[in-house]
Swiss-Prot record:
It catalyses: IMP + L-aspartate + GTP = N(6)-(1,2-dicarboxyethyl)-AMP + GDP + phosphate + 2 H(+). Substrate binds at residues 301-307. Homodimer. It comes from the Bacteria. The keyword Cytoplasm applies. It comes from Allorhizobium ampelinum (strain ATCC BAA-846 / DSM 112012 / S4). Belongs to the adenylosuccinate synthetase family. This is Adenylosuccinate synthetase. GTP binds at residues 12-18, 40-42, 307, 333-335, 415-417. Pathway: Purine metabolism; AMP biosynthesis via de novo pathway; AMP from IMP: step 1/2. Keywords: Cytoplasm, GTP-binding, Ligase, Magnesium, Metal-binding, Nucleotide-binding, Purine biosynthesis.
């Protein structure tokens, strides 16, 4: 038995929700370790769809403990709203099945407003990143700047007042620069104290709790959000998120040591998608790209934004295998490729006429690379609902084997529809 870390190996939206749900049924504890309510995922259980943004997937399954780690930035109002939405669907969330790290940073209204003001200004200047405007980046900035307000601060109104007084000069200076009105101390205090009684019952010393769970032999599932190519260090900077999204963050963002992480499962879509701005070497703007988007229902869970679509990029996933230490991948949405006459896989790039085997880190170079493709024959048969290798067309199996060879990691799971049971299991990550 081992613990499992689930990460996205592309730009997010790889289908982590289904795989995490499949794994969480067998886990005891499910931990979120980075990001905030900017990355959504949909779980389909017994025909009911649950859309989660902040809460760990384990929260919808009875008998599981869901944990929001210290690496997550928590919008308390979004948290309360998501809990209420689940309650309306018959899912009860209490401290018996959800704990939040007492040292997790809070997202405030001024973070959301700053995020929006920056995006508006960047849109006008042509430097837009394409954030969700939910205050994630500004909250992380305050965390790194050592002025953040954390979950535990809600329990001490007097100390909270001092911390609000410390954070406001920074934000009001920025707001003046954008021509926005300053924020009053009383506004933020009222905003926070109004949610304190609803948030504080969930607070926990998470590192200690997880250490106890580890010692008793609990199965722990670490649930990543977004994708490795959006990592603040290893992604396509500056078109990235504001946190580390690679597997190593599961340790730092939860308080467990790296030796406890175990199997690293990289969720990998059988083609490539991206939301928002930034480089995308294999992007297709033709009818094939439109086909992938429509058949794959490529619209964001949180924002509803249309995703950009393209061929599978083995060079980028190979980088993710290395930066995450991926043990095996879960290949998703293979069924979306059904019916295409031919398929292409990017194996490297040409940069100024020179062949290279990885995407360069420099933004200007990323904009100039041209993909180098291998072409494979497609298949006409349906792979939807396949649950064993024998159900797959020969060309589909050939495609999967080619992906494995090019990225340097084996397929542990193969997903053939949004339904959780439509999965071919090759290797059980919990038993590896």
């Amino acid at each position: 038995m081992t613990n499992v870390v689930v990460v996205g190996s592309q730009w997010g939206d790889e289908g982590k929700g289904k795989i995490v749900d499949w794994l969480s049924e067998r886990a005891d504890v499910v931990v979120r370790f980075q990001g905030g309510h900017n990355a959504g995922h949909t779980l389909v259980i017994d025909g009911i769809s649950y859309k989660l943004s902040l809460l760990p997937s384990g929260v919808v399954r009875p008998g599981k403990m869901a944990v929001i780690g210290n690496g997550v930035v928590v919008d308390p109002h979004a948290l309360i709203a998501e809990i209420a939405k689940l309650a309306a669907q018959g899912v009860t969330v209490t401290p018996d099945n959800l704990r939040i790290a007492d040292n997790a940073t809070l997202i405030l209204s001024l973070h959301r407003e700053l995020d929006g003001m920056r995006e508006d200004a960047a849109t006008n200047s042509g430097t837009k990143i394409g954030t969700t405007r939910r205050g994630i980046g500004p909250a992380y900035e305050d965390k790194v700047g050592r002025r953040a307000i954390r979950v535990m601060d809600l329990a001490d109104p007097e100390g909270l007042a001092e911390k609000v007084a410390r954070i406001l000069p920074h934000h009001n200076a920025l707001r003046r620069g954008f021509g926005a009105p300053e924020v009053e101390h009383s506004t933020i205090m009222e905003e926070l104290l109004s949610v304190a009684d609803k948030v504080l019952p969930f607070r926990e010393t998470v590192w200690l709790m997880l250490d106890k769970e580890r010692r008793r032999g609990a199965r722990i599932l670490f649930e990543g959000a977004q994708g490795s190519l959006l990592d603040i260090d290893h992604g396509t900077y500056p078109f990235v998120t504001s946190s580390n999204t690679v597997a190593g963050q599961a340790a730092a963002g939860s308080g467990m040591g790296p030796g406890s992480l175990g199997y690293i499962l990289g969720i990998t879509k059988a083609y490539t998608t991206r939301v928002g701005e930034g480089p995308f070497p294999t992007e297709l703007t033709d009818e094939v790209g439109q086909f992938l988007g429509e058949k794959g229902h490529e619209f964001g869970t949180v924002t509803g934004r249309k995703r950009r679509c393209g061929w599978f990029d083995a060079a980028l996933v190979r980088q993710s295998v290395a930066t995450n230490g991926i043990t095996g991948i879960a290949l998703t949405k293979l069924d979306v490729l059904d019916g295409l006459d031919e398929l292409k896989i990017c194996v490297g790039y040409k940069l100024d006429g020179v062949e290279i085997d990885h995407l360069p880190a420099a933004q200007a170079a990323q904009a100039r690379v041209e993909p180098i493709y291998v072409t494979l024959e497609g298949w006409k048969e349906s792979t939807v609902g396949a649950r064993k290798w024998a159900d797959l067309p020969a060309q589909a199996i050939k495609y999967v084997r080619q992906v494995e060879e090019l990225i340097g990691a084996p397929v542990a799971l193969l997903s053939t529809s949004p339904e959780r049971d439509d999965t071919i299991l090759v290797t059980d990550p919990f038993e590896d």
